[in-house]
């Protein structure tokens, strides 16, 4: 592996020295390898966890812990689709280190600040490692399937039936702003992980949980009815979850789309097959001339740091949906291929000449840059190979990761932990909430006018 890493890095450095922009020919595997190696190298420029005094698994500011989990999931896709193990040592070290003392992705450095959605994205990365048969950790370390099950179990224990008839709150802890909000990404991620665990393990309990979460989301109108299933942002317990925050984000649509695809592939149910197609129908809202974009914020150029990474997860979920549900392949691969070519043209900026941008419509770099931009370009490009690689493995078909159905339940519960909130704490939380509210109003005004 060390030899491969050295060769891989030398290849990237050579390409960097003599190449000004990413050139991509999707009919040429070597072209795709060269393009994605440049983008992956640029992504890892933001990684600081291998530097003295820094935290293993974490990227530079301003990138939060949850996005680090998303980034390692992206690098797993890069390894799998591009047959490139250059960064595998870093992936393993990061995902083990950040698992925490209880092996449930609630590490001490995040244990009072992380939300359900934050934990979920590390769990999704662990599930990907299990399904792709990624190198297993040493026997004395937690295994990928175990980690994914621990995330699912700890999240499921937080199911809040006392308000709005169920659902997960956005935040785990009462002192964090957003505790009174039940958002789609937390609930959609629980549904998504349950669907993947059902298929991998064959355990019906996970199917039951996926159906439970799905029906609750439909009941509070986070998922629309009809043949186009749009997915909305969240609801507040302050009004008994009766008013929907109607923003649509790519990664929320992708979580429900891919989760439905996993359930159809496992159960063979016509219902989940239909739902998969209906989520795919609604995904059209995120494409213009076949190119993916973040519709809620990209137009007014108001995407924040987190939102600039959402297309990465959407591309990932599109790719796996195409693997699992044959009827979706023509549409999805058309979107991925068109978007990949456009993304490559955007990767022509920065001092290195191949920094990726946010807006892929321009045919050139738009001046934006960051971890999210690199992740999005990389995911959309590597997932053009979705049909050239095996579908996710299961325990009965190629998967070797070892789990435990009770993983995570031995730890001290973190469900709705109490705290004596001071007036100062409430004031601080109020300021944060106000800022979020202003941002939402600004987006709404742009969408209307």
From Swiss-Prot:
Glycosylation, residue list: 34, 84, 109, 133, 203, 225, 240, 265, 281, 337, 362, 420
Reaction catalyzed: Random hydrolysis of (1->6)-alpha-D-mannosidic linkages in unbranched (1->6)-mannans
InterPro entries (alphabetical): 6-hairpin_glycosidase_sf (IPR008928), Glyco_hydro_76 (IPR005198), Mannan-1_6-alpha_mannosidase (IPR014480)
Keywords of this entry: Cell membrane, Cell wall biogenesis/degradation, Glycoprotein, Glycosidase, GPI-anchor, Hydrolase, Lipoprotein, Membrane, Signal
Propeptide section residues: 429-449
Signal peptide: 1-21
Domain of life of the organism encoding this protein: Eukaryota
A GO molecular-function annotation: mannan endo-1,6-alpha-mannosidase activity
Record GO cellular component, one term: endoplasmic reticulum
EC number: 3.2.1.101
Pfam families xrefs: Glyco_hydro_76
Gene Ontology biological process terms in this record: budding cell bud growth; carbohydrate catabolic process; cell wall organization; fungal-type cell wall biogenesis
Lipid-substituted positions (GPI-anchor amidated glycine): 428
Function: Required for normal synthesis of the cell wall.
Additional free-text comment from the UniProt record: Present with 2580 molecules/cell in log phase SD medium.
Family: Belongs to the glycosyl hydrolase 76 family.
Protein name according to UniProt: Mannan endo-1,6-alpha-mannosidase DCW1
Species per Swiss-Prot/TrEMBL record: Saccharomyces cerevisiae (strain ATCC 204508 / S288c)
Origin organism lineage: Eukaryota, Fungi, Dikarya, Ascomycota, Saccharomycotina
